[in-house]
Swiss-Prot record:
Domain of life: Bacteria
Binding, glycerol: R81, E82, Y133, D242, Q243
Species name: Afipia carboxidovorans (strain ATCC 49405 / DSM 1227 / KCTC 32145 / OM5) (Oligotropha carboxidovorans)
Entry's Gene Ontology cellular component terms: cytosol
Assigned keywords, A-Z: ATP-binding, Glycerol metabolism, Kinase, Nucleotide-binding, Transferase
Reactions accelerated catalytically: glycerol + ATP = sn-glycerol 3-phosphate + ADP + H(+)
Pathway the protein takes part in: Polyol metabolism; glycerol degradation via glycerol kinase pathway; sn-glycerol 3-phosphate from glycerol: step 1/1
This protein's name: Glycerol kinase
Regions that span the bilayer: none
Role summary: Key enzyme in the regulation of glycerol uptake and metabolism. Catalyzes the phosphorylation of glycerol to yield sn-glycerol 3-phosphate.
Gene Ontology molecular-function annotations: ATP binding; glycerol kinase activity
Binding, ADP: T11, R15, T264, G307, G411
InterPro entries per the UniProt record, alphabetical: ATPase_NBD (IPR043129), Carb_kinase_FGGY (IPR000577), Carb_kinase_FGGY_CS (IPR018483), FGGY_C (IPR018485), FGGY_N (IPR018484), Glycerol_kin (IPR005999)
Length: 498
């Protein structure tokens, strides 16, 4: 039997999943990745931790599955996007910790870009906005913060990569410095229409071109692993950023299809086909995937805090012991209390894009307790998704129909209570697939597609299987009241910054 090995390197953990030819799961392994918070709004990873946990989970998954390198047709990589690594070309050693996508240290730089009128250039080339979320300003920060780094980068001694690129470099022993179009599209440096690095943006953000990787299709020949890493050489044939990999794994190949992934954050992507829809509602225009040199575009809404709100209940407030406890508590909340959590722990993402505002709770009373906190945390994810859904329908009214279903995945998607509340708040059908690990599935499929062992997209889409469908049950009056309360809470928080 032939297998596919998927690497799913995320914000809080590294996971490896072994898939059979029919894309059923044979084995998996997962390890937590330590996070570092050196200052308020700063989030970092040690690149060595990323590498060590990735390699360890690949080996563990292969051992659990009883599979050797000879039986694996290809590796597919999905990764936390935007997270930035700069390393030495000669040694492979990172010159600074990886700056994570959640990190907000370059907020002032982005504010200056906006004030100086550069946002139209950024938007028309990249589909993005000037925000610390993206890689470009993170690269510039590292080059300025590490003594001598800028001069070394200009001499070609330093390389930049998102996590996929860094892992590919390590897997191939430094033989390949490459990424895919989806990851490139998240750097603030890539023209998503021309499909190339943009010299104007490189000059604007002061990033030397010599640092940048080559950009390839999502399903392509990326290189071969060193034989001693996994017991033999294995071809790497698929790469996509985690949210784009999930879009593929959810088989959202038709324009108008939408998926939303609920992990540390929440990321909703709407397939717009060959049309790159320019948002008028502060969404992002991005590359959904690129196959055979053809780009498919998407509208994306990025929410920085979803599952991490539940982590806050557990690790910050110590109200729960496990994430599942929030599911048990939320239904017990007092229905007469209107408690809202606006989880702007690292600012607000789409459609507000405010990196400076911080989180707040509204509607607390003397009777507010753990159940109300749990419900507010879970509902905050639903309300934020509603903000994205509303913006997407406004941006592309002809492409999104009211009866369109939302496909969901990620760790929070296993919560029946949250998914039912999501259907209620959005007033749309929410579909959860049989295989919840759609990010890894998408990476495996891309690798299999390039290997010739997976079917074309249309046939793969026909195999998508539904686990459970959640249909709206909330009455319109209750829904409207809840959404009005959320809108007031967000407006109150934004007003408090002024």
């Amino acid at each position: 039997m032939t297998y596919l090995l998927a690497i799913d390197q995320g914000t809080t953990s590294s996971r490896a999943m072994l898939f059979r030819e029919d894309l059923s799961v044979a084995a998996q392994a997962q390890q937590e990745v330590p996070q570092h918070f050196p200052a308020s709004g700063w989030v970092e990873h040690d690149p060595e931790d990323i590498w060590a946990t990735t390699l360890a989970t690949c080996r563990a998954a292969m051992e659990k599955g009883g599979v050797t390198a000879r039986e694996i047709a290809a590796i597919g990589i999905s990764n936390q996007r935007e997270t930035t690594v700069v390393w030495e070309r000669a040694s492979g050693k990172a010159i600074h910790r990886a700056i994570v996508w959640q990190d907000r240290r370059t907020a002032d730089v982005c504010a200056r870009l906006q004030a100086d009128g550069h946002e139209p250039l950024i938007a028309t080339r990249t589909g993005l906005i000037a925000d610390p979320y993206f890689s470009g300003t993170k690269i510039a920060w590292i080059l300025d913060a590490v003594p001598g780094a800028r001069a070394r980068a200009e001499r070609g001694e330093l390389l930049f990569g998102t996590v996929d690129c860094y892992l590919l470099w390590r897997l191939t022993g430094g033989a390949v410095h490459a990424t895919d179009a989806t990851n490139a599209s998240r750097t603030l440096l890539f023209d998503i229409y021309a499909g190339a690095w943009d010299d104007d943006l490189l000059r604007l953000l002061r990033v030397p071109r010599a640092m940048l990787p080559r950009v390839r299709d999502c399903a392509a020949e990326f290189g071969t692993t060193l034989p001693d890493l996994l017991g033999g050489p294995i071809a790497v044939r698929g790469i996509a950023g985690d949210q784009q990999a999930a879009t593929v794994g959810q088989a959202c190949f038709a324009p108008g299809m939408m998926k939303s992934t609920y992990g540390t954050g929440c990321f909703a992507l709407l397939n717009t086909g060959a049309t790159a829809v320019a948002s008028k509602n502060k969404l992002l225009t991005t590359i959904a995937y690129q196959l055979n040199g053809v780009r498919t575009y998407a509208l994306e809404g990025s929410i920085f805090v979803a599952g991490s709100a539940v982590q806050w209940l557990r690790d910050g407030l110590h109200l729960i012991k496990t994430a599942h406890d929030s599911d048990d508590l939320a239904p017990l909340a007092d229905a007469t209390q209107a408690v809202y959590l606006v989880p702007a722990f690292v600012g607000l993402g789409a459609p507000y894009w405010n990196p400076r505002v911080r989180g707040a709770l509204f509607g607390l009373t003397r009777n507010t307790g753990p159940a109300e906190f749990a419900q507010a945390a879970l509902e905050s994810v639903c309300y934020q998704t509603h903000d994205l859904w509303t913006a997407m329908r406004a941006d592309w009214p002809d492409g999104v129909t009211q009866n369109a279903a939302l496909r969901v995945d990620g760790g929070m998607a296993v919560s029946d209570w949250t998914m039912q509340r999501l259907a209620d708040i959005l007033n749309v059908t929410v579909d959860r697939p049989v295989i919840p690990e759609t990010t890894a599935l998408g990476a495996a499929y891309l690798a299999g597609l390039a290997s010739g062992i997976c079917p074309p997209p249309a046939e793969f889409a026909a195999r998508w299987q539904l686990d459970r469908r959640f249909t709206p049950e909330m009455d319109e009056e209750t829904r409207a009241r809840k959404l009005t309360g959320w809108t007031r809470a967000v407006k109150g928080l934004l007003a408090s910054e002024d």
